[in-house]
Each structure stands twice: as structure tokens, then as C-alpha cells.
Amino acid sequence: MRCRAIISLLIPVLLAGCGKGPVSEPSSRELTVFIGTDGYGDGSYNDTMLYGILGFCKDHPDVNLSLQQPENIADAGKRLDAWLSEEGSGDRALILASNTYEEILRGKSAPKNGRVLILETDDVFPGHSSYIIRRYGASWLSGAMSRYFVGIIFKAMDGNDMIEESARGFSNGHSAVSDQKVYTWTLANGPEGFAMRDSTYRYVYKKTEEFYESEEFFGDLLFFPLLGGSLPGLFDYCRYNGFIHIAGMDVDCTAFNPLVVPYSLCVNNHLALKMYLEDWLSGKPWPEHMEFGLESEYVQVVPNRQFSFENQDMAALHEEYYSRAVEKEKEYAAE
């Protein structure tokens, strides 16, 4: 998959650039990052986050970077306790780059000489910082732009707040402008659903066969994937089936296939992280909590201008429904 391959190739290059060059004395700035337990290289959430962090470190070689991938939540908890208890003399920052780490941060006291940021959570952690990039507006817009398709919301699991918000946004946007149906599939019962590439392929193969045989089915399919690291399994299946379409997710995947991907919902965590890290370097305190939505630069829906299925103009649909999606997101936030 091209969108995955590009980022996967860039990460080692950026990583090689961090920490290189002559250093006369140890840096007093230390940046530690716990990436998600599903790692990187899937072309989605973790990759965009990691790309931003490595780019920042390349621009600021005086910052010492410790990039860690805990084996599981329990391992992450031990690493967090060790970091919080360190008696370092420099300026330290820790980024918990997944909302699956909420449980290990909750109730922890602030470190004496550092700061902690956890990504993609709407919870507040006293003494620490958090932010969330809201997907409701972008998902509503995606649903409206999918008006000519039968929609399938494909979730990695049930009960994840960010996934449920996106699913609700897509469903509401689609139903507001379309007579086609929206279905929901769920891959797994827990977080393991975010790292099941092979199982995703088999699941979709079986479900679509059943779907096409259903008497109630009529129309062209479009997947709205909320799968994390399992997303490549869906792309693997769609690569060989020209009658199924898929929304790009997290990064711009429109180059995957102009006949398959009508648009991409892009989450620009690298831009949000750059803002936080630059504030850290300048000594500016981090807010306790921040939220960003469709009107910010941190989430956007990118139309595939090459998409030519039945002469659908994704750019025109984006322009038609964008303002309405912004208003719907504000209404949702006020609920």
C-alpha cells in the first residue's frame, strides 16, 4: 500500500537523523515517547504521530529522544512509574501516544522536573496534559460525501470513545443526505482488534460474501474503517475487488487506487505535537486539556480528485457539505 510504504520508509531515515552529530556534553532536555503497543508501520495513527516526533528531533538535535514500545499495558505502567520516579536534573517530557494508556496515568502525581502529555483522550488528568482531535465533524462530512454508497462502518472494537464518536458522525452525516443504508461491523471484543491484519482480511472476505448473497443488499459498498493497525488487511482485500470502496483513514491514501478511495480522513497529529513540543522548548506550560475539530488544521477530509466512479465529484461534495459538518460538530459538542 503506497500510503503505508512512504511513511514506513521515511521513519528509519528520520530516526537515523536523531541523536547524530558531535555532542560536547549531555543535553539537559530529554524526550521520552511511549508509542502504542501495536507499534508503527501500518500507515495510520502511530505513523503520523511518530513522523512528527522524529521530524522535531531532527530539527532539534540537542534533544535526547527515548522511543519506547511497551509490550502491553502492564509493561507500560512499569515504565511510567520508573519515569515518574527518576530524579533527573534536566528538563524532561513524556508523551503517551495512545489513549489506551489512560488507565496507567490516572491518579499519578506530576513529576518534579518534567511534564506528561497523553494523546487522543477527552479525560483530564490533574498535574498532566491531554488533548483530543475530535473526529465527529470530519466523520459527518465523510458520511455525507458517501451519499451514493451503502456504508459499512468497520470498527476494531466496541466501546472505544474515539471510535464510537467517529461511527456516530459518519452514520449521522450519511443518513442526513442519503437514502442508502449504513451497516456496522465489529472485528474483535477488545483492543486486540487494532492489530489483526490477517484476521481482518479473512473477516471481510467472509462477511462480504454473505453480504452479496443477502436479498436486502442493493448498491455499491464503501467501508469507513476505524481499525488502527488492522487497516492494511482491509486494503489488502479491496486491492483485488474493484466493486468495493474504502475511505482512507488517518493519512492521505487517495493514491492507493483512484477507483477505490474517494477521499481520506486525515488526522494530523504531527502538527499538534509540533505545537506542544515547540512550547516545551520555549518553556511555555502545556494546558491541562485541549480539543481540536474540523475547523482546526489537525483533522481534515481530503477529496481524491482522481476518483471517477460513476462521475462522482468528491471535491464538489466536500464543498457542499463542509460548512454543515462544522455546524453539526458544534451541535454535537454542546450535547
Go through the PLM ranges and name each one.
Residues G19-G21:
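Bacterial signal peptide processing site
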Residues L31-G52, F56, H60, L67-I73, ...:
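Extracytoplasmic "Venus flytrap"
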Residues V33-F34, G88-N99, L119, E216-G228, ...:
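Periplasmic-binding protein-like
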Residues I53, A138-L187, P287-E310:
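An alpha-beta-alpha
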Residues S130-I152, L265-G283:
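Hydrophobic alpha-helical segments within soluble ligand-binding/sensing domains
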Residues M275-E335:
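Hinge/cleft segment of the Venus flytrap/periplasmic-binding protein
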